[in-house]
Regions:
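Radical SAM enzyme [4Fe-4S]-AdoMet core and its adjacent flexible, acidic
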Residues: 2-181
Length: 182
C-alpha cells in the first residue's frame, strides 16, 4: 500500500494512508480530526519545538521528529521523551558532524533513530562506526537505529531481499512525497 507524505494542509486531498508533515506539534493537533487519525501512518514534526500538545492527542499515532541539526538540536529530545508513553516515537537526523551525541541521547531516552545518510566524509564514517558499536554492544539499547537495524535483520534472517530505498522509506512504489504545491 502506498503512503503519501503530505503537508498538513493537504490531508483532505489524499484519500488512503498518509504521513502528515507539520512544522510544529500544535499544527498536527489543529489540522487533524479524530476521523483523519484512522488513516494517518505517522506525523512528521520538522521543528524541534516542544511536543506537549501531542500528549493527549491521537494516542498511538507514530511521531517522527525531524532534527535538521542534530549536533545543536539534540537537547530538544528531552521535551519529547514523555511522548513515548502514548506514541511510537522516532527521531530522524542527517549524519553530519556531531550527530553521535543526538543518537546517544535518543537511545538513552528509549527513542528510535533513523539516520538520513548522504555521502559521508571521514568524520561521519567514524561516527557511524561508533553508532553501530553502540547499537550492537550497549545492552540498554532497546529501540532500532535505522538503517543499521533493517540491514542487520535482513542479513541475520535472510528473508526477502530489501533495498536501502525501502529501509529509508524512499521507495516510490511504497512512499510518495507530495510537496507544498501538491
Amino acid at each position: 500500500m502506498v503512503i503519501y507524505s503530505v503537508p498538513a494542509r493537504l490531508v483532505h486531498a489524499y484519500p488512503g494512508r498518509i504521513a502528515v508533515r507539520v512544522d510544529a506539534a500544535d499544527e498536527a493537533v489543529a489540522r487533524l480530526s479524530e476521523a483523519d487519525l484512522g488513516r494517518v501512518a505517522s506525523v512528521q514534526i520538522r521543528s524541534p519545538t516542544a511536543g506537549r500538545e501531542l500528549r493527549r492527542w491521537g494516542r498511538g499515532v507514530p511521531v517522527d521528529l525531524v532534527m535538521a541539526q542534530p549536533s545543536v538540536d539534540y537537547p530538544s529530545l528531552y521535551e519529547y521523551a514523555e511522548l513515548g508513553r502514548d506514541h511510537p516515537l522516532r527521531v530522524s537526523m542527517p549524519t553530519e558532524p556531531g550527530f553521535l551525541r543526538a543518537v546517544r541521547l535518543a537511545v538513552s531516552l528509549n527513542i528510535a533513530v533513523k539516520l538520513e545518510v548522504g555521502q559521508p566524509g571521514p568524520a561521519e564514517i567514524e561516527e557511524m562506526a561508533r553508532v553501530v558499536d553502540l547499537y550492537l554492544h550497549q545492552t540498554t539499547t532497546s529501540q532500532p537505529i535505522e538503517y543499521f537495524h533493517s540491514v542487520l535483520m535482513a542479513l541475520v534472517h535472510g528473508g526477502a531481499p530489501t533495498t536501502l530505498w525501502v529501509i529509508q522509506e524512499e521507495d516510490p512504489a511504497l512512499h510518495r512525497h507530495v510537496d507544498a504545491a501538491a
